[in-house]
Every structure is written in structure tokens, then in C-alpha cells.
Amino acid sequence: MKNVLILGGPGNISESTIRYFLEKKVPVGVLTHATTDLLGLDGKISVFRGDRNDIEDLMRVYREFDPEVIIDFCCFEPFQAKVVVEAVKQMHCARYIFVSTVDVYGYPLSRLPMRESDPWGEPNCLYAKNKKECEQIFKEGFADTSTSLTIARPAYSMGKTFALSAFERNRGKHIVARIREGKPVYVPGDGNALLQTGSAYNTGLMIARIAENDNCRDQDYTCGHDRLNTQDEYIKAFANVLGMPVKIVHIPTDFMYSLERKEVEDSILKDLSIHNIYFSVEKFKQEFPDFVWEYSMEDAARAFIEHQDKIGTFDKPLEEQFEDKVLEKWEKAMEALRQEIDF
């Protein structure tokens, strides 16, 4: 296999993709605008500074690096897809891997576990809507060209730089901080909703295997963990890694919506957290029966905590979030109610 060009990164998922190809002695180039952390890959990859939204930058990198395969980890908006299609048509690249998202299937899912071929619902957030439109732009743009398209749709992939809370996509660090401080952690509903937490390390390897296998041309694959967990188990994974107890407080989602607060409306509760999240990876397993999901959910939580400690995320107390303030008032109200119920 000749050169592999990564658009974006090195990041949460793409790091293990890059390391996989480096171990196989495949040259890897990365087009990035980042000027700092390369996650320990300094000197091991060809780094091209530039803007993936600029067709001239894309063409410059193509001429210098001559990739056989391009893996796009950072296409989030339709205009970005259009720029890439125009550039790749001039490049004549053999394969293009678009990293989309399982959110394009729409929630609630039409089937559990959700397969690639099952009926899709409408996207319920702008992120998913844009990714779905990008998929269509790539499909139409690469039709009848020499470039074959493969779509990889990662499920939730926790890793060094990314962990969800039930309320926001970037608040995993607040879960860690609250457990360390002995504070309760909010979980919606009764905590038994399915989440299917995966490791970014595993997901990155799945994408690498797809990118090197010609059988995957013109296909789409869900990339996620092969096991399930509940939302309560997700929080407990952080506590287990920290070696500390955690108090989980369940608050009904209907109550959260009844507050009619912008913070709730803008949260991921409606988009994600109140639904059962369960995707089939059987299509991937049929193509790669030897694949091993090496990292567990706790391994992923450990990678997140260790990296965030390393970069100083927890050096200063984290600001209390909206859901934490609601949780505190909920606890007081529930205690008052317990005292009222005396019969």
C-alpha cells in the first residue's frame, strides 16, 4: 500500500489509525491546521500545515505526498465536502474514506441493534444533518470517477481527548472532577438506557482495516464496540479507573424538559442521551472475523483520564455546570419530600 493522507488530526480516533499504518511501514501524511500536540507522533509522520477547506492547499499536499488513500476525519459541513470532491477529481486518488457518524441514522433508532441497511430516521441535530448531507455529496461527487468511496460511521468512541457526559459532548472531564471531589454525578432517567461506549483506539483500528482492504470499496460500515453498557455502567467505569466510589443521581428527563431552559434545549439529551444506542457491527465482523476489540470501556476511560491529567485539565477546579446545579437542588427537594412522606 502506498501513501495514506489523513485530513485532520492526529486526534481522538485517527491516532490509532495512523499508528497502525506506521507499524506496517506505510508512509502517513497529515494535513492539519494544528500547531501544537501531535500526540507523540512528531517526526514519525509527514505534517502538512494548511487549510482543508482551501482547494489550493489540498492540491499542494497531493502533489507533494501523492497519496493512494485519503481518510477524511474532519469534514463536518457540506461546503467542505464540495471542496474535497473538486480537489480529488483533479488528484485521481484511488480511494477516499469519509469518516461520518452513526448519528446520521436518526434517533430513536428504527431497530436495535441498528444495521447499516435498516430504515433511517431524520437527523435530530445539525451535526448529524450536515454529516448526512456530506455523505450524499461524496456519493454523487465520486460516482463515475476513478475514486472509490467508503463511508465509516463511528459510534461513541471515548479516548484521550474526548468523553461525553449525559448533557454535553465535551463534559467527560466534569464527570472525572466530580467523582474526585466526592460529588454526585447526574444520569438521565433510571440509568438503564443503552449507550454502547467504545474506545477510540479500537475505532481507529477498524477504520485502518477498512482503508487497506479493497473489498471495502463502495461500502459503508458502522464502527463501534461489540459490547453494550448502560449509562450507569458508563459512569461507574470512570469511578473504577479512579478507584473511588461514585454516587449517581437519576433525574427524570421529563422534569429536565419542564424547566424550559435553554441549557436543556441545547443539550444532547434530546439528540442522544434519552435514547437506547445500540448498533450492529456484524457487517464489519463478516469482513474482518479476526478483528479484536483490544480496549475495554474502562481502558478508554483510563486513556482519557491519564491524558487529561497530563495536559493539566484538572489543575484548577472546573466550573460547575448547569446540570450540576440542578442536581444539587433536586437532591435537597427529594430529601424534603422524604421527610414529608411520613405515614
Description of each model-found segment:
Residues 137-164:
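Conserved beta-loop-beta element that borders a ligand/cofactor-binding pocket
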Residues 209-269, 303, 314-343:
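Mid/C-terminal beta-alpha module of Rossmann-like enzyme folds, strongest
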Residues 4-24:
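N-terminal Rossmann NAD(P)H-binding glycine-rich loop of SDR-like oxidoreductase domains
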Residues 200, 258-291, 310-314:
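Conserved C-terminal active-site "lid" loop/helix of NAD(P)H-dependent oxidoreductases
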Residues 187-193, 221-228, 239, 272-273, ...:
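Glycine-rich Rossmann NAD(P)(H)-binding loop
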Residues 101-126, 140-145, 167:
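Active-site "gating" loop of Rossmann-like NAD(P)-dependent oxidoreductase/epimerase domains
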Residues 35-93, 98, 106, 111-113:
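NAD(P)H-binding glycine-rich loop region in Rossmannoid oxidoreductase-like domains
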Residues 167-175, 188-211, 218-219:
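Substrate-positioning beta->alpha
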